[in-house]
Design a protein with these regions (language model features):
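A short helix-turn-beta junction within AAA+ P-loop NTPase domains corresponding to the substrate/partner-engaging
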Residues: 484-488, 697-710
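Conserved P-loop NTPase
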Residues: 725-776
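P-loop NTPase motor domains
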Residues: 52, 59-78, 89, 252, ...
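Hydrophobic positions on the alpha1 helix immediately C-terminal to the Walker A/P-loop
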Residues: 451
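Extended, folded cores of ATP/NTP-driven motor/assembly subunits in large transport
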Residues: 1-405
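Post-Walker A helix-loop "phosphate-sensing" segment adjacent to the P-loop in P-loop NTPases
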Residues: 458-468
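Hydrophobic anchor at the beta1->P-loop junction of P-loop NTPases
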Residues: 440
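Conserved lysine of the Walker
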Residues: 448
């Protein structure tokens, strides 16, 4: 037997003790605040790693992930034992109601909250209310605690780098979090009751095991009883010649509370090579002796027996793997524990799990009279009390792939549908992102507008945040009014006016307000004169006149009224430059002419919690100007909310209109950068993706946006988005001829296929749909 395996087996040995209480059956000897435990004759520490999109990846991407995961296994230290644990935990109904459902507020909107809650409950039922978590535990032999801490610090750096290359990331968990894992397993349904304060427990003389142990624990021949539940530990006895990379995924997808662990014992390459060479020498010796016996019988043409030839070939192949293909030799052990409410259910679940393994040509067996050792092996203590080891290479071990699909379930986030692969809820908190702004992109009829309204309703019903909507197509008035909002129509024929030259205290935030207003006026004039037609001298005149009209206002320290566009045009007319006449003529229509809606003092009050700025009747000529002016006006409200400590959500439909002109696109980009600092999130929607992508500003905003909802896309748009966002061909399949409400969600570095549909019989659907005859 190899020295490394002998040493590992010796470290697993512990003096046998008959437990006289449930607490004594838990093999934790000592705990430290930094998450290190002494278990038996070993020290252990646990890291959590996040899931990645393996199931939804293309074949090439799967190969890449497979190689990267193999590199993770190769990087494991040879003087430690690794345990990869997948935990399936059913959501506690009380916790689910507290964290996922909207509480009633008695504000007249509880009917809609009830519909939302029912939608979430129905979707959660389809996913069996399961949460999957993944951990890796490393354990080493006893040594001084200072040396142990230094060792795990080095390992922490290596694990973070290795899993980081997989876009997964590994994070060490605290002592309290490790205890919580055991508490949630031993006491299912009581997850919310766990409390751990080490210093307080020491003062009160409370053993930490008292906080996590079940009410009772009794081991039988082939199962165990735990606090009114029944459990059984299985181990993988038979391995297929070619194991499917989906076997672990299929087992862990089983809709019960279960833990699946893969114990991995890496062997140093030098020792593994010596062992394989020794085996080759032994096989060659056996073949030579067999041939000598045949020669003594005058049988000089006999063929080497198949079993000996097979052993020689396999041993040589293994040696080549170790010496030429960067493979390492590993011992592996797969164990699984599942829990049920009754013994009958436990037996049925065991048969189902064994059938899943048999479909992949593998076999799981019950640990007879070893249930306690099996339980201590499968739980993330860092122990291995089962000796059913299988010799594997790195590639063979990497086939036991723990990854399935990325999940996004942020505490306190908003509901964005369900994961199309796992059917789990997608709960996203955009506020935690570096940039909370978002794009919703899709062709007409793909569900983009419904998703916008869905987000608006979610924010309105589950938070106290303010909502402002710039509505270019008159789509959002019904849902805004239903949620208690106000709709302000701005048109040449209305009495509502917005002065684009308004300055709010703090507007500039360290920047030059004159330069910013000059850019705004340039954008307005560009839309009147045509994109790219403003000369350098005309821009200089615009900037000079803008500074001049604000001069008196600043000298009066706010005692005078804000300047108007008509004041600005009068200043232009006083300029001696011949280009000034052209500028004044272009500005005449929007200052003195029939489209002078923005040449009046602001008389719009947008202090309602939900406000829609309806620009539908502005007409094609004035609508781009209206979009820019409305966004400029919203900035004042955003800054006011910032001072009050209130978050603001701003929604922009048909955002492609901003990118038709250079300066309006730059104004939007400026708001995109600044609103994050002001405590506001912008959400922009467009069906004309190709039109947007013609703008370098838009491409930059897309690439830097950390939240995207991509619905069904045209072929040309898919190709552009694939290049810009690095979306694989398999992922593109989710936005190719996709049904309404289906697509891809990108949040941070995660890309998840999603489904977000609203039942047709609900009032929410009638408020959100744009289908003629179905909307309110």
């Amino acid at each position: 037997m190899m020295k490394s395996l002998l040493a590992a087996n010796r470290s697993e040995k512990d003096s046998f003790r008959i437990p006289h209480s449930v607490q004594q059956s838990i093999p934790i000897r000592r705990i430290y605040t930094d998450g290190i435990w002494q278990v038996g004759q070993k020290y252990s520490k646990t890291w959590r790693f996040s899931d990645i999109n393996y199931a939804a990846s293309s074949l090439d991407d799967r190969r890449s992930i497979f190689r990267s995961y193999g590199a993770v296994l190769n990087s494991l230290p040879t003087d430690a034992t690794a345990k990869i644990t997948i935990i399936n935990r059913r959501l506690n109904p009380v916790d689910f109601q507290r964290t996922m459902l909207m509480p009633e507020c008695s504000d007249g909107l509880d009917y809609y909250r009830g519909e939302y809650n029912q939608i979430i409950l129905d979707k959660a039922a389809e996913s069996n209310n399961l949460v999957q978590e993944k951990y890796i535990t490393l354990s080493i032999g006893l040594r001084k605690i200072e040396q142990t801490r230094a060792y795990f610090r080095r390992v922490d750096t290596n694990l973070s780098a290795s899993f980081g290359r997989l876009d997964s990331g590994a994070y060490a968990i605290s002592c309290a979090d490790r205890l919580r894992l055991l508490h949630d397993f031993f006491r299912p349904g009581e997850e919310a009751s766990f409390r751990f304060d080490l210093s307080a427990n020491i003062k009160r003389g409370i053993d930490f095991r008292d906080l996590i142990c079940p009410d009772g624990l009794q081991f039988r021949a082939g199962y165990f009883e735990m606090g009114g539940k029944f459990g059984r530990v299985l181990f993988m006895r038979d391995y297929a010649s070619f194991i499917s990379d989906e076997m672990i995924k299929d087992l862990s997808d089983f809709s019960r509370n279960l833990l699946l662990s893969i114990d991995i014992l890496p062997i140093p390459t030098e020792e593994a090579v010596r062992e394989v060479q020794s085996r080759i020498l032994g096989v060659e010796t056996d073949i030579t002796r067999w041939q000598q016996r045949q020669n003594r019988q005058n049988n000089f043409t006999a063929t080497v027996p198949y079993d000996l030839e097979q052993m020689r070939t396999e041993s040589k192949d293994l040696l080549e793997d170790l010496t030429a293909r960067d493979q390492r030799l590993m011992f592996a052990c797969v164990t699984l524990v599942h829990i049920a409410d009754s013994l009958e259910q436990l037996d049925a679940d065991t048969q189902t799990l064994q059938s899943i393994a048999q479909e992949k040509l593998c076999g799981f067996s019950v640990l007879r009279y070893q249930q306690e050792d099996g339980l201590n092996t499968v739980l993330p203590y860092g122990l291995r009390r089962i000796h059913a080891l299988r010799t594997l290479t790195t590639e063979s071990c990497a086939v036991l792939m723990p990854f399935r699909a990325q999940e996004i379930q942020d505490p306190g986030g908003l509901y964005y549908g369900v994961n199309a692969i796992s059917k789990n809820l997608l709960i996203c908190d955009r506020k935690r992102l570096i940039s909370p702004h978002a794009f919703y992109l899709g062709v007409s009829g793909s569900g983009k507008s419904v998703a916008m309204k869905n987000t608006i309703a979610n924010v309105a019903l589950s938070t106290n945040d303010d909502i402002i909507i710039i509505d270019a197509e008159r789509e959002y008035a019904p849902i805004a009014r239903a949620l208690g909002g106000e709709v302000i129509e701005i048109s040449p024929n209305s009495q509502h006016h917005i002065n684009p030259l308004d300055l709010q205290d703090g507007y500039e935030d360290g920047e030059n307000p004159i330069a910013m207003k000059s850019e705004l006026i340039t954008s307005i004039l560009e839309q009147q004169m045509g994109a790219g037609l403003l000369s350098g001298s005309q821009k200089s005149i615009i900037d000079r006149c803008t500074a001049s009209v604000y001069q008196n206002y600043f000298h009066a320290k706010g005692a005078l009224p804000m300047p108007l566009l008509s004041d600005w045009r009068a200043e232009v007319l006083q300029q001696p430059d011949p280009e000034a006449r052209e500028i004044a003529l272009a500005a005449e229509l929007i200052t003195e002419g029939s489209l002078n809606v923005f040449a009046h003092p602001t008389n719009v009050d947008i202090h309602n919690r939900i406000v829609v700025l309806d620009l539908y009747e502005m007409g094609e000529q004035l609508r781009p100007t209206a979009l820019v002016v409305a966004l400029e006006a919203i900035q004042n409200r955003v800054m006011e909310n910032r001072k009050r400590g209130k978050y603001t959500w701003v929604f922009l439909d048909e955002v492609y209109l901003y990118f038709k002109y250079k300066y309006s696109g730059e104004i939007l980009y400026r708001a995109w950068k600044r609103f994050r600092k002001y405590g506001a999130a912008l959400t922009a929607a467009s069906q004309n993706v190709e039109e947007c992508l013609k703008s370098e500003t838009a491409r930059l905003m897309f690439a830097n946006s950390e939240f995207l909802l991509l619905f069904n896309q045209a072929a040309t748009d898919r190709a552009e988005l694939s290049k810009l966002l690095h979306i694989s061909d398999t992922q593109l399949g989710y936005i190719t001829n996709a049904e309404a409400g289906h697509g891809l969600l990108r949040m941070g570095g995660s890309i998840v296929p999603f489904v977000n549909t609203i039942p047709r019989q609900t009032e929410l659907y009638k408020l959100m749909t744009t289908t003629p005859g179905e909307s309110r």
